[in-house]
């Protein structure tokens, strides 16, 4: 497929073990072209997630500029990075990035996002698998981008479809919880948003055997195996699953296989204060209530369920294809 026919993707990310999985999944997709990787705080500080994005793109020959973005949430204080999930270095503390020092490309992630979208009207999908701060900043810098993007696909939120609630708190998913004001800004902007939240991603489990098979198949699978030993262990203890959740991969899979997802339409708001801070709530279209904070906001799509096995299979096929 010629590059001009491919879907252009800005990958906004906080690598992060499942972010690394998603980036390698994207590399394997012939119908997608990465226009930029933009980084933000989340699984580690921005300096670390940027270094990791640079390391991953260079090690796996992904030809794309990496732009560093926000280092803190819009309004609230930055909480501690979850080293117990992704390691101090964000990639499982196996020493992958030790002594790796390459500078990101010039410019702030939010500015570059705006430029790329304006230069390619109707062609760019933002795939955001991290706190939504860069997207909110981009909207503030130029609200006009809302009508120019093709789609905004997010790994974020937990909408209690199928009873699934939070992972950062009992009601809040981590990416939304890390910057609830940014998430509310992104969900209430007048642009298309599809959210693939914990409702779906927590059912997309690559088993220990899946990971072992991929590890014996080539460098990408071996690398993912190495960095995900502690991650898998955490999921085994915390979620009682024999493997780990492919959160960010599931959102990436939506770009190439949307038929795997069942979506619900309705306005989405995010709680920005109090004990439920970071909770994401969808008011389904057609449900009638009294006046509420959801009124006047355009509908967004939220994945309620999906073909979980199909998503895991797509991931395995992608990583295998990288050799
Ligand atoms: C999300 O939070 C991060 O820790 C993961 O990379 C994923 O994007 C899951 O809640
Ligand atoms: Ca992530």
Model-derived regions, located:
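Conformational coupling and interaction surfaces
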Residues: 2-6, 25-26, 33-34, 174-177, ...
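Active-site histidine-anchored catalytic micro-motif
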Residues: 3-13, 17-55, 95-201
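Metal-dependent C-N hydrolase catalytic cores
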Residues: 7, 50-119, 297-310, 316-320
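Short, glycine/acidic-enriched capping/hinge loops at junctions between secondary-structure elements
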Residues: 21-23, 48-49, 77-79, 281-283, ...
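Short secondary-structure boundary/hinge segments and terminal tails
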Residues: 44-45, 74-77, 204-205
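A residue-level signal for conserved active-site and pocket-lining positions in enzyme catalytic cores
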Residues: 66, 186, 252
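Short, well-ordered secondary-structure micro-motifs
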Residues: 77-79, 163-165, 206-208
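Short, surface-exposed amphipathic charged segments that create phosphate/polyanion-binding patches used
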Residues: 80-87, 166-170, 211
């Amino acid at each position: 497929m010629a590059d001009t026919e491919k879907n252009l993707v800005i990958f906004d990310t906080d690598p992060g073990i499942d972010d690394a999985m998603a980036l390698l999944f994207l590399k394997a997709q012939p119908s997608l072209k990465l226009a930029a990787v933009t980084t933000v705080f989340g699984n580690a500080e921005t300096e670390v997630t940027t270094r990791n994005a640079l390391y991953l793109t260079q090690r796996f020959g992904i030809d794309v500029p990496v732009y560093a973005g926000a280092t803190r949430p819009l309004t609230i204080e930055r909480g501690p990075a979850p080293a117990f999930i992704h390691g101090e270095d964000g990639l499982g503390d196996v020493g992958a990035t030790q002594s790796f020092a390459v500078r990101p490309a010039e410019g702030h992630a939010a500015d570059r996002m705006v430029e790329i979208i304006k230069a390619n009207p109707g062609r760019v999908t933002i795939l955001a698998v991290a706190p939504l701060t860069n997207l909110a900043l981009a909207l503030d810098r130029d609200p006009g981008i809302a009508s120019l993007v093709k789609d905004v696909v997010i790994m974020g939120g937990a909408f209690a479809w199928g009873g699934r609630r939070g992972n950062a708190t009992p009601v809040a998913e981590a990416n939304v919880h890390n910057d609830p004001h940014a998430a509310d800004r992104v969900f209430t902007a007048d642009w298309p948003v599809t959210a693939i939240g914990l409702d779906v991603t927590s059912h997309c489990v690559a088993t220990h055997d899946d990971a072992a098979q991929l590890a014996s198949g080539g460098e990408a699978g071996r690398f993912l195996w190495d960095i995900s030993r502690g991650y898998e262990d955490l999921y085994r203890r915390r979620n009682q699953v024999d493997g780990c959740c492919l959160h960010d991969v599931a959102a990436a899979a939506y770009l190439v296989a949307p038929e795997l997802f069942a979506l619900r339409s309705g306005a989405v708001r995010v709680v920005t204060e109090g004990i439920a801070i970071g909770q994401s709530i969808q008011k389904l279209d057609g449900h009638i209530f009294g006046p509420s904070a959801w009124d006047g906001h355009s509908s967004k799509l939220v994945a309620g369920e999906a073909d979980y096995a199909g998503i895991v299979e797509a991931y395995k096929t992608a990583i295998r294809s990288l050799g």
